[in-house]
Every structure is written in structure tokens, then in C-alpha cells.
């Protein structure tokens, strides 16, 4: 039997059975879930109604994630799935779906922040810098350009929770696209109240 999205196979509200008065139709069909995993990119195309195409991501390892408060979007590596409101099984099997909470690599965001504000981010006290990083952070600049950076530094404060994550090199993010439909795992970095909420949830789950 094929997967069907009809409702005439269900009983009536009164509990009586329904007689099927037509066969299954093409427009009622359902397909098996993609169950996208973390791994080297593998995407299948599916021909769908109206001559359109869907992109069924079976494995993905990178995505485009946006850091909302800094208006910075970068392509970065997806490391792990840590929370899913709908189903713990999807966390255990590391399945990428819309609205699941994942850990992503923070390096692209740190590099952008350091070059934009000329301030170190998520570095341990007294840690040695490589010559390139030294060049970015402690470069000699003309007065005009230095003034521009000083103006930027006034708004360079980020929350302590995010700073902790940058020190570990991983950020919590939420997937906003549908990997099994569009073949991509894009989303946004968690911040503020939303980040606090999910940190509590993850902690509670670990405590069980």
C-alpha cells in the first residue's frame, strides 16, 4: 500500500466506517521522509506535481546561518544535532529537520567580527595570536580609518552567553529551511531569550 494523505480511510466522527467510493488518487500521495543526516552532501531530485522539482537532502554537512543582531550571514559546518522539540528520536539519530537545534562551527563569525570591529572574540586570556590575526587586530591604521573602527567599537558588545559559545568554538543555531524539500539546511544563530530558553531545555534533557 502506498503512503496516502487522504482522510476517507478514517472512521466518521460518530464511529461508523466509511466506504471508499474512489481509488487512491495521485494528488493524495505521500512520500517517505527524507531523514536528512549529517555527512558529505547527497541530494536526490524528486519530480513533483506541476512539473516542479523538489530536492531531497539525504545528507548535509554545511549550511548558511545568519547572525541576526550583527547582520552577518556565513556558510558554516554543521557539527551536531542537540535538541528537537518534536521528537528525541530525531536527536539520537542526528536527523536534520526544520526547527531543530544544531551546533555549528563559530570560526567564520569570529573572523568576521574580528575584522569588522578589530576586537578579539572568544579568545582565552593571554592566548598567542598567529601573524595574520595579529595583523588584523593590532594593525597600524590612519587616523580616519581608526576613527571609523572606534565608532564601530561603541556597538561591539555581545552577550556573555554568546561569548562563552565562541570560546568553545561552537554556536547553537536553529534550522529554518526544510532540508527534505529544498535540499538545504539554512537557519539562524540563537540569541537572547530564545538562546536562554533552549539552553535550559538542553540542560534539562541532559539531567534526565
Curated annotation (Swiss-Prot):
Keywords: Acetylation, Cytoplasm, Isopeptide bond, Lipoprotein, Membrane, Myristate, Nucleus, Phosphoprotein, Ribonucleoprotein, Ribosomal protein, Ubl conjugation. It is a lipid-anchor. A lipid is attached at residue 2 (N-myristoyl glycine). GO terms for cellular component: cytosolic ribosome; membrane; nucleolus; ribonucleoprotein complex. Gene3D superfamilies: 3.10.290.70, Ribosomal protein S8e, subdomain. Pfam families: Ribosomal_S8e. Residues 8-26 have a biased composition (Basic residues). Residues 1-27 are annotated as: Disordered. CDD domains: Ribosomal_S8e_like (cd11380). The modification Phosphoserine is found at residue 160. It is found in: Cytoplasm; Membrane; Nucleus, Nucleolus. GO terms for molecular function: structural constituent of ribosome. The modification N6-acetyllysine is found at residues 37, 128. There is a cross-link at residues 170, 193 (Glycyl lysine isopeptide (Lys-Gly) (interchain with G-Cter in SUMO2)). The modification Phosphothreonine is found at residue 130. GO terms for biological process: translation. Its main location: cytoplasm. Component of the small ribosomal subunit. Identified in a IGF2BP1-dependent mRNP granule complex containing untranslated mRNAs. Part of the small subunit (SSU) processome, composed of more than 70 proteins and the RNA chaperone small nucleolar RNA (snoRNA) U3. Component of the small ribosomal subunit. The ribosome is a large ribonucleoprotein complex responsible for the synthesis of proteins in the cell. Part of the small subunit (SSU) processome, first precursor of the small eukaryotic ribosomal subunit. During the assembly of the SSU processome in the nucleolus, many ribosome biogenesis factors, an RNA chaperone and ribosomal proteins associate with the nascent pre-rRNA and work in concert to generate RNA folding, modifications, rearrangements and cleavage as well as targeted degradation of pre-ribosomal RNA by the RNA exosome. Belongs to the eukaryotic ribosomal protein eS8 family. This is Small ribosomal subunit protein eS8. It comes from Oryctolagus cuniculus. The gene is RPS8.
Amino acid at each position: 500500500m502506498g503512503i496516502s494523505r487522504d482522510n476517507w480511510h478514517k472512521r466518521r466522527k460518530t464511529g461508523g466506517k466509511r466506504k471508499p467510493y474512489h481509488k487512491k488518487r495521485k494528488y493524495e500521495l505521500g512520500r517517505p521522509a527524507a531523514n536528512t543526516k549529517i555527512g558529505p552532501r547527497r541530494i536526490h531530485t524528486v519530480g513533483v506535481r506541476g512539473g516542479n522539482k523538489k530536492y531531497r537532502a539525504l545528507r548535509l554537512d554545511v549550511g548558511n546561518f545568519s547572525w541576526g543582531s550583527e547582520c552577518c550571514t556565513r556558510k558554516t559546518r554543521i557539527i551536531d544535532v542537540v535538541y528537537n522539540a518534536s521528537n528525541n528520536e530525531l536527536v539520537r539519530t542526528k536527523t536534520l529537520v526544520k526547527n531543530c537545534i544544531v551546533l555549528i562551527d563559530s570560526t567564520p563569525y569570529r573572523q568576521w567580527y574580528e575584522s569588522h570591529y578589530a576586537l578579539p572574540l572568544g579568545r582565552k586570556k593571554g592566548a598567542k595570536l598567529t601573524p595574520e590575526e595579529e595583523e588584523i587586530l593590532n594593525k597600524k591604521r590612519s587616523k580616519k580609518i581608526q576613527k571609523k573602527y572606534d565608532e564601530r567599537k561603541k556597538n561591539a558588545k555581545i552577550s556573555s552567553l554568546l561569548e562563552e559559545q565562541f570560546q568553545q568554538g561552537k554556536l547553537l543555531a536553529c534550522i529554518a529551511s526544510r532540508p527534505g524539500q529544498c535540499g538545504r539546511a539554512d537557519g539562524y544563530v540563537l540569541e537572547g531569550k530564545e538562546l536562554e530558553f533552549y539552553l535550559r531545555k538542553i540542560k534539562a534533557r541532559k539531567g534526565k
